[in-house]
């Protein structure tokens, strides 16, 4: 399944969550798109709820189905709770860490920065958005890319960095100090439903 590239606001309303991180998509119209307005949401079956939760998380991180399933299977081989491990692995992706550091305003922008070779990991260029960042690794911006407006504007408006990250706005450099705890990640997601979906 290919990555969704359509209007994010429309998808946000369909899934009932903000994919931009701003919440603006749901402020005026907190219901699914379509001609029937706010009363059109149907009661979902158990399978429908599980599928919807999977789609919410997949689109939140902007990954395709193959990448999503591969990471889910990888999480299942780790000690601990399968669902929590999966959430932590998703959050450890390089594109997500770039976004959480405030170097991009959306995960889609962060993925583009990585793809185009603007991001360094421990001083070396890494252009793979799915690269899993390890605790202790440093994320920075290439010298030639430091004046990109997309980065400068993002850093200027960002006023929150999670506790498991540190960020130096002057150096445009951050450190993934530790793995996040489940309580620090997407409270609107019920990962148990996703585990149930893939266990069918």
UniProtKB/Swiss-Prot annotation:
The reply to whether Nucleotide-binding figures as a keyword in the UniProt entry is no
> Which controlled-vocabulary keywords does the entry list?
Repressor, Ribonucleoprotein, Ribosomal protein, RNA-binding, rRNA-binding
Please give the annotated consequence of changing residue 46 to K: In rpsD3; suppresses S12 mutation K55D
Against Pfam families, the record matches this protein to: Ribosomal_S4, S4
Highest rank taxon of the organism:
Bacteria
What does the UniProt record say this protein does?
A: One of the primary rRNA binding proteins, it binds directly to 16S rRNA where it nucleates assembly of the body of the 30S subunit.
InterPro entries found in the cross-reference section = Ribosomal_uS4, Ribosomal_uS4_bac-type, Ribosomal_uS4_CS, Ribosomal_uS4_N, S4_RNA-bd, S4_RNA-bd_sf
GO annotation (BP), single: ribosomal small subunit biogenesis
Q: How does it assemble?
A: Part of the 30S ribosomal subunit. Contacts protein S5. The interaction surface between S4 and S5 is involved in control of translational fidelity.
Indicate yes or no for the key word Magnesium: no
What organism does this protein naturally occur in? Bacillus subtilis (strain 168)
The similarity comment for this entry is: Belongs to the universal ribosomal protein uS4 family.
Q: Which NCBIfam families match?
A: PRK05327.1, rpsD_bact
Positions of the region Disordered? 22-42
**What's the protein here called?**
Small ribosomal subunit protein uS4
Q: Name one GO molecular function term.
A: structural constituent of ribosome
GO CC terms for this protein? small ribosomal subunit
Domain S4 RNA-binding residues, every copy: 92-155
Q: Which gene encodes it?
A: rpsD
């Amino acid at each position: 399944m290919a990555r969704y590239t359509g209007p994010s606001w429309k998808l946000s309303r369909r899934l009932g969550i903000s994919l931009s991180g701003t919440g603006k998509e749901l402020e005026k119209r907190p219901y699914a798109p379509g001609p029937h307005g706010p009363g059109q949401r149907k009661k979902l079956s158990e399978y429908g709820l599980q599928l919807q939760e999977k789609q919410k998380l997949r689109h939140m991180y902007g990954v395709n189905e193959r990448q999503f399933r591969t990471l889910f299977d990888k999480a299942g081989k780790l000690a601990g709770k399968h669902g929590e491990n999966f959430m932590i692995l998703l959050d450890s992706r390089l594109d997500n860490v770039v976004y959480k550091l405030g170097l991009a305003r959306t995960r889609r922008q962060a993925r583009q920065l990585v793809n185009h070779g603007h991001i360094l990991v421990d001083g070396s260029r890494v252009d793979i958005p799915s690269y899993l960042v390890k605790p202790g690794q440093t994320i920075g911006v290439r010298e030639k890319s430091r004046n990109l407006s997309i980065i400068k504007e993002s850093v200027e408006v960002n006023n929150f960095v999670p506790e498991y990250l540190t960020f130096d706005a002057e150096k445009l450099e951050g450190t993934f100090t530790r793995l996040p705890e489940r309580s620090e990640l997407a409270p609107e997601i019920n990962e148990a439903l996703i585990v149930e979906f893939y266990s069918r």
